């Protein structure tokens, strides 16, 4: 779980960097493409390009296309039709998708994993909910697709590593993830990108480099590596832990307003969802 906890803090910090220095200023598709390219350069010399099971290669490329490519395209498109509170609210359903996809791939139904995911959703909703406007169906559907593809990528990668074991460390087989992400990010930039909204100064370029090298390269790898080391219920819950962490960082570093009672209550509910999942695991073993 240590990988997931580290990346939770990393991504929570990254969310604030995007909000402060990139959102509304730098073209979103260019930002996504830059992150993929920089992360790919990190893994280019690390990746074993020969002697890897072709079905594993294809599977990891699919994971990259789903978990990073399609997810981020849908996320940015949703901002065209939703308010920020609505976007934040509708992304809290990711744990449910994680639990359901894991059950689907393993041809079973795990009540406790789904229950823990729903409790985590409740905790995140307590923190994020701030009312929604009337016309939100299109944005809601876009974000459910983003939630689904992000969840599917994690669960699929976990399954691929288990199904195709190798003496190679995971870092030598992960570069294919960014190849798959590039197959989505590059066409998205060519079709929807605005070349007039490129980074304007050293600060924005610096944030993009930081996002590509740390949040994307290290973050995506460690998140997926961490996913292989925990059960589906824990993975589902961890997908919402960034909510209180992100708001806390926003309060402490950027001095933004946060509803501390709601933050504390929602965070406690998310932590309680981990207990629900552990309770379920004890019941299954018994």
Swiss-Prot record:
Pfam families: EamA (PF00892). It is a multi-pass membrane protein. It catalyses: biotin(in) = biotin(out). The chain crosses the membrane at residues 4-24, 26-46, 56-76, 81-101, 109-129, 136-156, 174-194, 203-223, 234-254, 258-280. Keywords: Cell inner membrane, Cell membrane, Membrane, Repeat, Transmembrane, Transmembrane helix, Transport. GO terms for cellular component: membrane; plasma membrane. The keyword Iron-sulfur does not apply. Disulfide bonds: none annotated. Residues 3-128, 139-277 form the EamA domain. InterPro entries: CO/AA/NH_transpt, EamA_dom. Its main location: membrane. SUPFAM superfamilies: Multidrug resistance efflux transporter EmrE. The keyword Iron does not apply. It is found in: Cell inner membrane. Belongs to the drug/metabolite transporter (DMT) superfamily. 10 TMS drug/metabolite exporter (DME) (TC 2.A.7.3) family. NCBIfam families: 2A78. Uptake of biotin. This is Probable biotin transporter. It comes from Pseudomonas aeruginosa (strain ATCC 15692 / DSM 22644 / CIP 104116 / JCM 14847 / LMG 12228 / 1C / PRS 101 / PAO1).
């Amino acid at each position: 779980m240590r990988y997931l906890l580290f990346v939770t803090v990393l991504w929570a910090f990254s969310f604030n960097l995007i909000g402060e220095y990139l959102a509304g200023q730098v073209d979103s598709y260019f930002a996504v493409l830059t992150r993929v390219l920089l992360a790919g350069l990190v893994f280019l010399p690390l990746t074993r390009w020969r002697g890897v099971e072709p079905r594993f290669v294809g599977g990891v490329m699919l994971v990259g296309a789903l978990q990073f490519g399609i997810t981020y395209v849908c996320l940015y498109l949703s901002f065209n039709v939703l308010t920020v509170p609505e976007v934040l609210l509708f992304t809290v359903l990711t744990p449910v998708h994680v639990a359901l996809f894991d059950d689907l791939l393993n041809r079973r139904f795990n009540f406790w994993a789904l229950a823990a995911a729903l409790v985590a959703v409740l905790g995140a909703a307590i923190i994020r909910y701030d009312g929604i406007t009337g016309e939100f169906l299109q944005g809601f559907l876009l974000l459910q697709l983003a939630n689904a593809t992000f969840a599917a990528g994690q669960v699929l990668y976990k399954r691929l590593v288990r199904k195709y074991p190798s003496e190679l460390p995971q870092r030598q087989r992960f570069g294919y993830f960014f190849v798959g992400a590039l197959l989505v990010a590059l066409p998205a930039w060519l079709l929807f990108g605005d070349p007039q909204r490129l980074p304007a100064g050293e600060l924005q370029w610096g944030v993009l480099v930081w996002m590509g090298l740390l949040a994307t390269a290290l973050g995506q790898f460690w998140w997926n590596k961490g996913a292989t080391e925990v059960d589906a219920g824990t993975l589902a819950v961890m997908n919402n832990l960034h909510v209180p962490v992100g708001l806390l960082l926003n309060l402490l570093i950027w001095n933004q307003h946060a509803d501390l009672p709601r933050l504390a209550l929602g965070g406690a509910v998310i932590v309680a969802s981990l207990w629900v999942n552990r309770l379920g695991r004890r019941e299954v073993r018994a």
